[in-house]
């Protein structure tokens, strides 16, 4: 939990009491290799903060082929954000690529933070801005780079990923 506390403190000014209240319903969960953190078809009600391991965001096309949309490594948030925000069934699977530990923030904690923290809205905005910029870069990479260039540049965003993730997952990215 300390890694998440440190992350939040770097983003906003927050009292120890408010931080404790925000994280009072958060839990740390362990996920085995290839275990799902969340599945398509269910409304996401949690946001995950990776403290150890790697999570892969996967979408499966109509032919059953998996496509890696995103990875999350240590000290990053991950969720099916569209499903979470719109309160609609998820389109993505979140899968632990290796043994993964994540802090799970339930919707109630996030909602409490927005409503009660002096800088709760700012925290949410900063996380959303990070994810928006990541997705924008991802779209540019898909359309402006060759597959080889994308493969070679993935370490800019995810250091050491070639040693941590099977090649077929990187190739589908």
Name each model-derived stretch.
Residues 1, 109-110, 124, 131-133:
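Alpha-helical bundle regulatory/interaction domains
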Residues 1-27:
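Cyclic nucleotide-binding regulatory module and flanking cytosolic helices
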Residues 4-5, 131-140:
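Short, Lys/Arg-enriched N-terminal segment that forms or immediately precedes the first helix
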Residues 27, 54-59, 77, 101-102:
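Short beta-strand segments in beta-sandwich/barrel cores
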Residues 34, 45, 49-56, 74-75:
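Glycine- and acidic-residue-biased ligand/ion/polar-headgroup-sensing regions
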Residues 37-42:
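Short phosphate-coordinating micro-motif centered on Lys-Gly-acidic
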Residues 68-126:
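Cyclic-nucleotide recognition modules
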Residues 145-173:
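Phosphate-/nucleic-acid-contacting segments
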